[in-house]
């Protein structure tokens, strides 16, 4: 419930809550010419909210949560998937799959957030200015991706 207002602020729409995650879409329900920048700004603000939440938890003697983030931009199909017995609205496509693969890949890179260099460059061209310097990770092998790709850290 803490993240949804942040997501809404940046024009994102929650697709689903798979397991302990949140799948968010940009530029699907509401058109945006800055969708990649919106997504990365959203991650920045969610990270800040998580830091504050972690401090609250630690003040109560609870453990802060360790969260990870991934962002991939590209075309998706948005709509109903399934049949008459089970129908679900969702997004499918290469960028949705890439985001899932990047989320898993954060462990290999020992970081808390990743995006593709292509998505990062698109966000910058849309006006995104990272609040802290980002590191580019060249020619990384990501499980399930055919060719090596360049990545950018979102959260170290």
Task: Cite the ranges covered by each PLM segment.
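Alpha-helical scaffold within the catalytic cores of cyclic-nucleotide enzymes
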Residues: 1-12, 28-69, 73, 94-104, ...
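A short pre-motif secondary-structure segment
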Residues: 14-16
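Helical mechanochemical/support elements of P-loop NTPase systems and associated helical scaffolds
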Residues: 18, 35, 77, 91-98, ...
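Short beta-strand/turn "edge" motifs
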Residues: 19-23
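Short beta-strand-to-turn element immediately C-terminal to the catalytic PLP-Schiff-base lysine
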Residues: 25-27, 154
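Cytosolic regulatory/linker segments at or just downstream of nucleotide-handling modules
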Residues: 76, 105-156
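Cytochrome P450 core scaffold surrounding the K-helix E-X-X-R motif
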Residues: 80-82
């Amino acid at each position: 419930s803490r993240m949804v207002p942040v997501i809404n602020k940046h024009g994102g729409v929650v697709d689903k809550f798979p397991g302990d995650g949140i799948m968010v879409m940009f530029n699907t329900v509401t058109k945006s010419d800055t969708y990649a920048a919106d997504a990365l700004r959203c991650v920045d603000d969610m990270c800040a909210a998580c830091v504050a939440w972690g401090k609250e938890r630690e003040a109560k003697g609870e453990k802060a949560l360790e969260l990870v983030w991934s962002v991939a931009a590209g075309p998706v199909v948005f709509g109903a998937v399934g049949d008459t017995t089970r129908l679900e609205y969702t997004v499918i496509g290469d960028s949705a799959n890439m985001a899932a693969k990047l989320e898993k890949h954060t462990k290999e890179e020992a970081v808390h957030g990743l995006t593709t260099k292509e998505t990062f460059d698109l966000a910058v061209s849309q006006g995104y200015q990272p609040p802290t310097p980002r590191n580019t990770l060249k020619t990384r092998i990501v499980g399930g991706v055919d060719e090596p790709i360049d990545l950018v850290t979102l959260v170290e």
